[in-house]
Every structure is written in C-alpha cells, then in structure tokens.
Amino acid sequence: MKKYIVPMKKLLFTALMISAFSACTTDTDTNENIVVDPVAVATCSDGIQNGDETGVDCGGSCSSCDIELEGTLSQNLTLDSENNYSLTGALIVPNGITLTIPAGVTIKATRGTSAYIAIAQGGKLNVYGTAQEPVIMTSGAADPQAGDWGGLVICGKAPTNVGVSATSEVADLTYGGTDINDNSGTIQYLRVEYTGATYTNEKEFNGVSLFGVGAGTIFQYVQSFEAGDDGIEFFGGTVNGNYLVSVGSGDDSIDFADGWNGSGSYWYITQGAKAGIEGSNNGDNGDATPVTQVSLSNISVVGPVSEGALYYKEGGGIFQIDNLFVAALDDQVIKVKSTDSEAQTRLNNGSLTITNLTGATDKASLSTGFDFTNYENISLSTEGLGAGAGAAYPEWAAGWSRQ
C-alpha cells in the first residue's frame, strides 16, 4: 500500500522555515501563541511506507525488503546475499535453467507442503556456500519446528531400478534414465532446516531428496537439521555424497534405495529417531537391478536409535563400509526384518562388508531381527574415529552446520 511520503529535502526546508519564523518574532507579536505541528520523521518501525523506503518499514535506509520466491523459472536466476528471500510456494527450476545461490544467502519458507524447491531433469542448482557463510534454507516461522515446509528436491537422468521414467514421491517430477554422469549442479556448504512437511503418512518431504541424480553433480558439505522425515535420501542415481551431517531427523538420518550406485565419505549422524543409515534395494522387488551398491567410509552414528546404525532392508544391496564408529546404540548395529528373505540371503552371502567397526561389543550381538551368521566380512576395532572425532562433533562440520 502506498503511503504519503515526505521527501527528506522537504523535511529540512520545513525545519529551517520554522527556525527562521521563530527568530523573527518579537515580544509584541500578537501571534505568540501559534502552535506549529511537528513534522513527522520516517522510521523503520512505524508500520507505513515513508521516507526512502521501498516497502513498509523496509528498503532504502531500512533493512532490505523480502523478495518472494515462487513459480517456475523462465530464465537463469542468481540470488544476492544482500537480500532477504521468502519461499512462498513451490520454486521449480526446469530443464535448461540454472538457479545460483552464493554464500551467505538465507531463504525462509512459509509453512506447509506447498513451499519447496525442486530441480527438474536438465535443470541445475549451484549452491556456493562456504564454511564461514553457508547457504541456509529454513523455516520462516517465529517458532520453527520439524515439518514446517517441504525441502529440497533434485531430479536427474541417472539410472535407478524403478525405471527410466519414474515420478518423484513429492513434487511429481520425472527422474531416472541412462546418463551415469548427469550433472544437476554443484551443491556445497548448504544447511537445510525444519523440513519434512507431510501430505499423508506415506508421503512426506525429506530434508534433501536426490532422485536419479548423476555423478556429474557435486554434493558435499550438506546438513539436514530437524527434518520431520528422513534427513537426506538418495533414490537411485550415481551421485556421491561427502561430508554430510544429519541432526535430529524424525525418521532415518541418511537413506539410500532404488539402485543407488555411489559413494560417501565423512558422514556424521546423531539424534535420529529411527535408523542412522537405511539402505535398501527396492521396496517392491528386493532383487531389482541395478542393485544398490555403495562404498562408505568414515561414518559416525550416535544414538539412541530405534532401528540400528544400519537398517539393511528390502533386499539390501552390496555395501562396503570402512571406519564405522557407533555410540549409544545398545548394540543395535545392524537391523534386518525377519521377513526380508532377499536381504537375509545377501547378508549371509557376504554382500555386507564392514571393516574397522568401532563401538560394537562383539560380533554375535551385531544384528537385531535376524540371526546373522556370516561374520567373515566384519572386523572390529577399538581405534576408529568414524567421521573424525568419534561420537563428538567433527571439526570439518564446524561453522557451517549446527548441533
């Protein structure tokens, strides 16, 4: 709403005239009781647009006005750390378009399932945060909490075992294909907070969801904080994920499924409600191909958790894990459902290898829900530090992430 604006030059002129008028009066003036109304001075908290403001109490000499983000981009967009951004609905980055977010940008989302950021196949997201100035995507609520808004969804063209043209669980975007090296951009030093808005009990956002994202994508130094569902989840694809943090997820902390063929190093996981890591092949067909195959190293999982440091489910896959540190788990290192025959078969055939497992008391108590008999590929250690500092917060996570 446009309000009456008094230019600063006019304010100064008026003040000078009042001063001059006062100086010219004498004791004999008959108008000595004249009262001159004071000139209103614009402030940044008076609830109206005035002075040099470009909005109500914002812009000009005041703090920057919020810029609303919503809709499907039609051209490349680069944000500016000097601005305030409000995510008021779905922001879609379509094929051929790039969204670039430099260091220090914060995006605050309105509450509900309609507020999320989605990168479609062929679109790109470049997040150029730094350890000192991360990019933050968070809730705009005065009392933020898990599940406030959607989250970040990225869809690529890399292989999955659910088909070459699947539809994402949220945002209804196509993903999957045959391009192993598909590139969805560069994402580094990103913190995503209070995500996980719920559609139904079976459909809700994660902090970051990567659907068929390819190995040409850089995904590192990313944190999910207080997600209502999973923190970070890989749905197939070939992208690698390094230096990942999940704190306070409402479900699994880091999840991968649907034929993810990638690697991850330096993951710090704590305060998750269910599994530290959930690794599965395919919920409808445990033998689907390509089989989930991952190589992980330098991992810390700090409990308590209700479904183990690793929940090996729905056919599991071929997992190689080195330097796994676990704490506060009550020996819940590996969980397998008693009815998951494909996962059980793979486990006893040696498809899970864990070297330098620190924090477990003995091999016989590693698994819950299943009598695990093949321990040849699991070696215990007393010296591993997992993500770098054992159960403590790692040094590489300082500054840009939060505990």
List PLM regions with ranges.
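Glycine-rich loop(s) and the adjacent beta-strand/alpha-helix scaffold that form part
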Residues: E133-P134
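Disulfide-bonded cysteine-rich modules in secreted/extracellular proteins
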Residues: V41-N50, I67-Q75
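Bacterial Sec-dependent N-terminal signal peptides
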Residues: Y4, L16-G47, G55, G59, ...
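Catalytic metal-binding/acid-base residues of hydrolase active sites
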Residues: T106
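Bacterial N-terminal signal peptides that target proteins for export
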Residues: K2-L12
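Extracellular beta-rich repeat passengers
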Residues: L69-D80, L87-P94, T98-L99, T110-G122, ...
